[in-house]
Curated annotation (Swiss-Prot):
Assembly, per entry: Component of the ribosomal small subunit (SSU) processome composed of at least 40 protein subunits and snoRNA U3. Interacts with snoRNA U3.
Ranges of biased composition (kind: Basic residues): 259-270
Protein family per UniProt: Belongs to the UTP11 family.
Naturally occurring in which organism (per UniProt): Chaetomium thermophilum (strain DSM 1495 / CBS 144.50 / IMI 039719) (Thermochaetoides thermophila)
Functional note: Involved in nucleolar processing of pre-18S ribosomal RNA.
Record flagged with keyword Metal-binding: no
GO BP, sorted A to Z: rRNA processing
Protein name as it appears in the record: U3 small nucleolar RNA-associated protein 11
GO cellular component: nucleolus; small-subunit processome
Biased composition (Basic and acidic residues): 15-24, 168-182
PANTHER family: U3 SMALL NUCLEOLAR RNA-ASSOCIATED PROTEIN 11 (PTHR12838), U3 SMALL NUCLEOLAR RNA-ASSOCIATED PROTEIN 11-RELATED (PTHR12838:SF0)
Region of interest (Disordered), ranges: 1-24, 137-211, 249-270
Keyword flag Transcription regulation: no
Compartment annotation: Nucleus, Nucleolus
Length: 270
């Protein structure tokens, strides 16, 4: 009963609170909490020390099968600070069978073939429109598009020139003039070389010829882009057909043997 009597009289224990500016850090740490944290820290430091010693004294010819799950030796060195310690092993992804992959390539081939047929129809319509617009005498290759100029590198870089000014006002006036010239140049390029000053001097026939030439140039650019798209789709279709043929169960043409000879399959005589 004496212990119960003392327990009733004992004051309730309260944790010491942090000062107002340190309330975000939680309650104050006691000595027992510090001992646990220090013991855990020293234990981890001892483990790291032993691991460093093992790494320094390791055998270069050592091998165990856990190494097979790594990309290469020293992942921490190749990946740098982003290395988390995990190795690239089995992620649970199941490898698809050859038959399944071949079926998927068949679906891809069907999609590419459909898009190639659509692109071929579009190209045919554009070529017919180009001929009807009067481009039978002018081949499409005569018109140089912007893409051709970029690929050929015909646009040379402008030489840089350093200009010195006496004052800030003179420099500001020169910058405003340069900006106005660039805006005027962009406006002229948008008009595609169409000069409004010569419009009054031109006759109706010349105006019609000029409009016809602009339409032909526009159609020629579209025809070139359609041909480029059709060629890319045809190349993709050929590559998919070749991959599908190489994945067949029997030997097909397009592959090579281990000795380097090309596989040639002859059809059975009928």
């Amino acid at each position: 009963m004496s212990s119960l009597r003392h327990a009733i009289q004992r004051r309730a224990h309260k944790e010491r609170a942090q000062p107002l500016e340190r309330q975000r850090l939680g309650i104050l740490e006691k000595k027992k909490d510090y001992r646990l944290r220090a013991r855990d820290y020293k234990k981890k430091q001892a483990v790291l020390k032993s691991l460093r010693q093992k790494a320094a004294e390791r055998n270069e010819d050592e091998f165990y099968f856990g190494m097979m799950s790594r990309k290469g030796p020293g992942s921490a060195l190749t990946r740098g600070k982003g290395f988390t310690g995990t190795v690239d092993g089995d992620r649970g992804n199941k490898a698809l069978s050859v038959e399944t992959v071949r079926l998927l390539k068949t679906q891809d081939l069907g999609y590419v073939r459909t898009m190639r047929n659509i692109a071929a129809k579009e190209l045919k319509e554009l070529e017919e429109r180009y001929v009807l617009a009067g481009g039978a005498d002018q081949p499409v290759e005569e018109f140089n598009s912007d893409e051709d100029e970029e690929e050929s590198g015909s646009k040379q870089a402008k030489p840089k020139k350093i200009v010195f000014f006496e004052g800030v006002e003179e420099r500001q006036q020169a910058l405003e003039k340069q900006k106005a010239d660039e805006e005027m140049k962009d406006y002229d390029e948008e008009e595609d070389g169409y000069d409004f000053d010569d419009e009054e001097e031109m006759t109706e026939k010349e105006k019609e010829e000029r409009r016809k030439q602009l339409v032909l140039e526009k159609l020629a650019r579209k025809v070139k882009a359609a041909r480029k798209k059709l060629k890319a789709l045809a190349d993709a279709e050929y590559e998919l057909e070749l991959q599908q043929a190489k994945m067949a169960k029997t030997a097909t043409s397009g592959g090579f043997t281990k000795s380097g000879r090309r596989i040639k399959v002859r059809e059975r005589k009928r």
